[in-house]
Amino acid sequence: MPILKERKWELIRSFQHHDKDTGSPEVQIAILTERINKLTEHMKQNKKDLHSRRGLIAMVNKRKALLDYLKRKNYQKYLEVSEKLNLRVKN
């Protein structure tokens, strides 16, 4: 489930460090979270769609790796991003 271009840029603008920042961990986590939420809704309707389920699991694992990286590098940013995106935080 692709996300709309406008929504993607909205997410980028809210998490970027400077005007041309589109690849920082915070931005990547925000975009992945949006895609995960969309795909989760799709999976509720289409329980037997195993290809999408595999993609969903891959996205969740990628987001977890990015969150772990952010937690190691900048714990304060990790907490801010987690709170802003309503993600559960393990202490």
From Swiss-Prot:
Example of a GO MF term: rRNA binding
Protein family: Belongs to the universal ribosomal protein uS15 family.
CDD domains tied to this protein: Ribosomal_S15p_S13e
Record keywords: Ribonucleoprotein, Ribosomal protein, RNA-binding, rRNA-binding
Stated role: One of the primary rRNA binding proteins, it binds directly to 16S rRNA where it helps nucleate assembly of the platform of the 30S subunit by binding and bridging several RNA helices of the 16S rRNA.
Name of the molecule in the record: Small ribosomal subunit protein uS15
Cited HAMAP family: Ribosomal_uS15_B
Entry GO terms, CC: cytosolic small ribosomal subunit
Coiled-coil stretches: none
Gene3D superfamilies in the cross-refs: 6.10.250.3130, S15/NS1, RNA-binding (1.10.287.10)
NCBIfam families: S15_bact (TIGR00952)
GO biological process: translation
UniProt xrefs under InterPro entries: Ribosomal_uS15, Ribosomal_uS15_bac-type, uS15_NS1_RNA-bd_sf
Any Pfam family matching the protein: Ribosomal_S15
PROSITE patterns found in the cross-reference section: RIBOSOMAL_S15 (PS00362)
Self-association state and partner proteins as the record states: Part of the 30S ribosomal subunit. Forms a bridge to the 50S subunit in the 70S ribosome, contacting the 23S rRNA.
